[in-house]
């Protein structure tokens, strides 16, 4: 996690030129793999329509002009110059934009929001709240609740299309690279070689996801760099050898000549031209792994010139060759000299694998983010690296992607249909980014609405033109991303809707603290040894599932902790700010509330690390709470604070590094102390306490030292602190039980048919076939106690 925090929070001004150059080099393999392989299929997809490649070269020059200005307007101007600046604490992507908007305007649909969340270090605002409150756009957005839902749906549409791109990009990239074999095989063998080889490479690629990319990731940047140099060299050779005057096609007049001559078919061919932008969104989505200056430097100095040379070289060759058997032969390999075709083929396949790996990893990441916003069913998230927090693997999604990729390859069998499908997914994500960025310009950057409107109209009109050209090809492959998006949208909306309704049900049926305190006298409550962790989505009150539990079985643990694991609209929550600790009832009741906060890019800790850090945090909170109560009693404090505000003030961290700092600040409470010892089980263990790999490499123990003699005016209070710490230590030694609710959801009688289909059929099917909350929270089965709860929504 340290590495990820360092990347996400790096200030561009602090990077030396050596660091920037290194990051720019590394970004080639992660960010630009997909974008760099687009020359493999752009011309072939464009001329797959009924466009005749005539000897006047108006068609090929028009396509080159479109490609040049599209690469200039969208990746270079829109993304590199504008969108990359709309980062969320160094993070980019659709959820980063949505998070920024939610922090500057109350439009989030996430439940259990707290004022304490605004005190997080990563919860920074671009302007003061006084100025933000005067924004009429903000007031209008907050006033209409339907706009909140519309905004979330827009974000989910972009998310669904990114997932769809994770299916289509590996298929078209690898297929286009392998299709170079057509020039070395006879016509009878082409059909039986290209498709099987593509499927084998795809299966091999997805099978290796379980092992992670950190072992071979160092090869990605050299492969892409070699590929860019190769394309540039081929482009220069073709320009010099075939048509040095091809630069004339950069004149935008050729675009109008192209559309005038080709008319309807020229407009439809824009669906193939837009593929030159494939991978542009990765510049923004992977911003957190590098820096703005590094990504900008890599694109402007290497990627952009290499792509322009590659496309110009293809156009130069095609401008002197018109005798093709079919327009489908107007591809990348036709312009490669025979002597270097095999090395170029091997390098193209390697580059396509690197580009596919980037989109697969991005799919895992965006699904994990959707899960954190309660917009995706629970899936198993596995760390593939002990040192790098962001490298994750989701088994269920991986195998589904593999099956769909192979099915697309076998089903479509050509670049035309794959390109039509991929193009629609790509341009939809870009449209969503344009709309969200226009809101960021108004709400976060506090620019005039006219400026945001100009941004939206200019780039939105360009992308809408490409979108219409892709949508018209619905029957020729574009139906696939639409079908995938509709299915994923249904899953996400059903899960999100039911999750929100369950939270509202819990909020309505929670019981008061007085009820819990009076429960012991009414039922003869028994306190058993150990720590009981009651998981709930509520940040206040006692959940209904716990009241049901103690009503039927009047006993609970010696130390009771109500744990709320919640997501906040920030990319990361620093370990020192993750926990909010407060009391439930008087100190003698030994009941606490712990709110654990995660960002949308955070991955939950393993249970051993969480349990240890929770005990550390409780011990530190007990001491701090005693010192505050002493100061309040001596007249130094004011009115009694609400529980949530006290929890914010007493926020502590389970990380041993931050725990030492906190201990130094509370040494005035000498009644007890907490010592954290860390023992490495093997050398070379990771420094990432928050990752499962890091937890496996070290054993953490918490030891309590209770002073027998206390020489202070507050001896009685310190004695109470010592007793409370002794009780906590004894409960920790007795073991920990995890109490979770096992939900059964059903609709109210008289509900609409749509609601019954969504809840009774859709949600219950997903709940039964997806991971349970115990798996998502990594609860050991031996310590799990589930309480049945019926939700009538």
From Swiss-Prot:
- Molecular-function annotations in GO: potassium ion transmembrane transporter activity
Give TM regions: 23-43, 60-80, 152-172, 192-212, 216-236, 265-285, 293-313, 344-364, 392-412, 423-443, 449-469, 474-494
Q: Name one GO cellular component term.
A: membrane
Cytoplasmic-side segments: 1-22, 81-151, 213-215, 286-292, 365-391, 444-448, 495-793
Q: An example of a Gene Ontology BP annotation on this entry?
A: potassium ion transport
- List the keywords (alphabetical): Glycoprotein, Ion transport, Membrane, Potassium, Potassium transport, Transmembrane, Transmembrane helix, Transport
Look up keyword Zinc-finger and say if it applies: no
Keyword Aminoacyl-tRNA synthetase belongs to the record: no
Q: Which residues lie on this side of the membrane: Extracellular?
A: 44-59, 173-191, 237-264, 314-343, 413-422, 470-473
Stated membrane topology is:
Multi-pass membrane protein
**Where is this chain's protein located in or outside the cell?**
Membrane
Glycosylation positions in this chain = 420
The record's region (Disordered) falls at 664-698
Chain intervals with Polar residues compositional bias? 664-675
Instruction: Tell me the InterPro entries matching this sequence.
Output: K+_transporter (IPR003855), K_trans_C (IPR053952), K_trans_N (IPR053951)
Family under the similarity heading? Belongs to the HAK/KUP transporter (TC 2.A.72.3) family.
Physiological role: High-affinity potassium transporter.
| Protein name, per record | Putative potassium transporter 8
* Encoding gene (name): HAK8
